[in-house]
């Protein structure tokens, strides 16, 4: 009989990420929703190989402080719930799962600047391992780059479609937002 054991946090995060990040389009959706929730008026999106190799979202939203950036990559941390109730949600996202889930299965680079700071800060999550924040350059808002999607769970890559199909699904997500 198999012995029951507690899973390590890294594996728990990778499993949870599968609920949020199924393919490049789902990662892109989460990033664009975050930009919109931050009040962005302009959002630039770059995809390489249908988002499999890279997804970069640059926005002119409110940005984040280094402390908020560190919290944003923790599971269940959010700025979008005004109190302890789910009755008063006015944002696209609120669960605090997107960034930690993406960071658990890829390389996530988060660069942001907000009012009161003379330079931006960059924080990197590589397969769940955090480095930073460190000083960076960015004029306004946030830039989030996701590279090597599913590097921590390569079996997920087998379920992706062609680059063209993944690119089309990313375009569909953006049109719907």
Question: What would you call each of these model-derived segments?
Answer:
Residues 1-177:
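N-terminal phosphate-binding caps/lids of nucleotide- and nucleic-acid-binding domains
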